[in-house]
Amino acid sequence: MQLPISQYNELLQKKLEKLTALLRPFNAPDIQVFDSPTSHYRMRAEFRIWHEQDDFYHIMFDQATLQRYRVDEFPIASTQINRMMQTLLPLLKQQEVLHKKLFQIDYLSTLSNKIIVSLLYHKTLTEEWESAAKNLKDLLEKQGFNVQIIGRASKQKICFEQDYVDEVLPVNGRNYVYRQVENSFTQPNATVNCKMLEWAIDCTQNSEGDLLELYCGNGNFSIALAQNFRKVLATEIAKPSVAAAQFNIAENKVDNLQIIRMSAEEFTQAMNGVRAFNRLKGIDLKSYECNTIFVDPPRAGLDPDTVKLVQNYDRILYISCNPHTLCDNLVELSKTHRIEKAALFDQFPYTDHMESGVWLIRK
């Protein structure tokens, strides 16, 4: 697999032109552009495993034709994932219990040189598999990998030490530690993620009052942004992400950030006094003066009720993975707010996907 590296700047310019055109109706200022490394930028990857007689190998599917194709190296992924791909398969081939009915391998790597390998099977994992997997982990560690092996099957998950890695991200000269849990969302392009965090910190400098973040994940943004606010209140619904966020808050010595496990809808009910929640015992919502809100919604964008919710805040920091739904939301948001800053983050080079950000101030 070869990447069109010589065309990188041209492709990025086309994305900029497209985003500029989309934001033009909203009187956006000049868009800041944050580029990506041209190869080995993706920190996670998933591959199906194709078995052919006595052989097996990684495959992917062509999005246009749906035809499978063999993948022996993957220059999009980190150098660590590539090295693991080439080291792992020969070791799996040595033990039938490790490769029989293996149908998928997921890799999660970090800038801090740690990696999780998840092996997915169409069979029950036995003590024999556990013994072989422990031996596999030892062999990989002898080859210099800081690795966690996880086995997954129907209603089964086996891990030997931990199901997470601790990433270290350099942001504005400071290192932030983020616990990343296997099978949970993490930003795929770590280098661009650092640039996103730096841009968000820059936008919110000199902020007054408190910050509210909806669906904070492992605290990726709220932990870095806490330095700019008196207090930060963040919501997240997934238990593993909440646990990771709590660890990250302590590890990064952030003392003004509170995570609550509830949905955006539940939070709105609590703020409006519609109903009480046991999860909020000990948290005085009235003590927060949140005049800034941060949102990073899924590709579908914000639903109409959440758009109305965020319009109540003087300042809105909106990170989007879909510029079309961002613009749909801006139709309403631009009635009350103006775009102060706009950015393009090239999280996904060589694709049409665009990550963007807007910093909105009440008119």
UniProtKB/Swiss-Prot annotation:
Pfam families: tRNA_U5-meth_tr. Dual-specificity methyltransferase that catalyzes the formation of 5-methyluridine at position 54 (m5U54) in all tRNAs, and that of position 341 (m5U341) in tmRNA (transfer-mRNA). This is tRNA/tmRNA (uracil-C(5))-methyltransferase. HAMAP family: RNA_methyltr_TrmA. The keyword tRNA processing applies. SUPFAM superfamilies: S-adenosyl-L-methionine-dependent methyltransferases. Belongs to the class I-like SAM-binding methyltransferase superfamily. RNA M5U methyltransferase family. TrmA subfamily. One of its GO terms (biological process) is tRNA methylation. It catalyses: uridine(54) in tRNA + S-adenosyl-L-methionine = 5-methyluridine(54) in tRNA + S-adenosyl-L-homocysteine + H(+); uridine(341) in tmRNA + S-adenosyl-L-methionine = 5-methyluridine(341) in tmRNA + S-adenosyl-L-homocysteine + H(+). It comes from the Bacteria. S-adenosyl-L-methionine binds at residues 187, 215, 220, 236, 296. Its EC number is 2.1.1.-, 2.1.1.35.
